[in-house]
């Protein structure tokens, strides 16, 4: 269902049957993710956005609404590359930067770039960020303006000229690097 509010269109998905009939879906349906029924998609200016998956454990305030051992999942769009890097920092996820790569031998830097599916020379990159460990697709994924999850091997340029390098990892692509060219 599409709803227009103040000239902006929002897509929603509501459960069609069962005990949750009419409730907004939180989760995946047809390669798209929804939060409380609202489609999660990148803004038209952004082109692509990283979505962070947050899981919250059951607590005393939710005892009546959640079954034993059930968690709540929420999807948060990160505004831009800076917000994504800040989130990685806050969660202790280390990544290589251009400065790190420049401090290595040419062969070592070239291998890291190649492993991250970046076929550019380091000198041609303005910025580069490559997680040192594989990011879990259960924690981060990339969506386009249609809301479709980027799930194939690709390089996806956002509205700020950053490329998100994605590798196929099941239903959700794994973000393996971010870079921008000079």
Enumerate the predicted regions with their spans.
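Extracellular adhesion/carbohydrate-binding repeat motifs centered on closely spaced tryptophans
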Residues: 1-182
């Amino acid at each position: 269902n599409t709803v227009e509010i103040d000239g902006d269109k929002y897509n929603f998905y509501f459960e069609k049957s069962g005990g949750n009939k009419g409730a907004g879906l939180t989760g995946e349906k047809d390669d798209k993710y929804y939060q409380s029924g609202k489609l999660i998609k990148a803004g038209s200016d952004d082109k692509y956005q990283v979505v962070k998956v947050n899981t919250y454990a059951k607590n005393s305030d939710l005892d009546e609404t959640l079954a034993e051992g059930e968690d709540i999942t929420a999807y948060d769009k990160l505004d831009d590359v800076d917000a994504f890097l800040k989130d990685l920092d806050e969660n202790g996820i280390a990544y290589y930067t251009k400065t790190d790569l420049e401090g290595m031998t040419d062969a070592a830097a070239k291998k890291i770039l190649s492993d991250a599916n970046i076929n550019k020379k380091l000198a041609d990159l303005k910025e580069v960020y490559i997680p040192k460990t594989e990011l879990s697709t259960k924690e981060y994924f990339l969506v386009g303006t249609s809301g479709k999850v980027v799930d194939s091997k690709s390089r996806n340029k956002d509205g700020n000229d950053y490329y998100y390098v994605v590798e196929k990892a099941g239903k959700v692509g794994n973000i393996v690097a971010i870079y921008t060219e000079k």
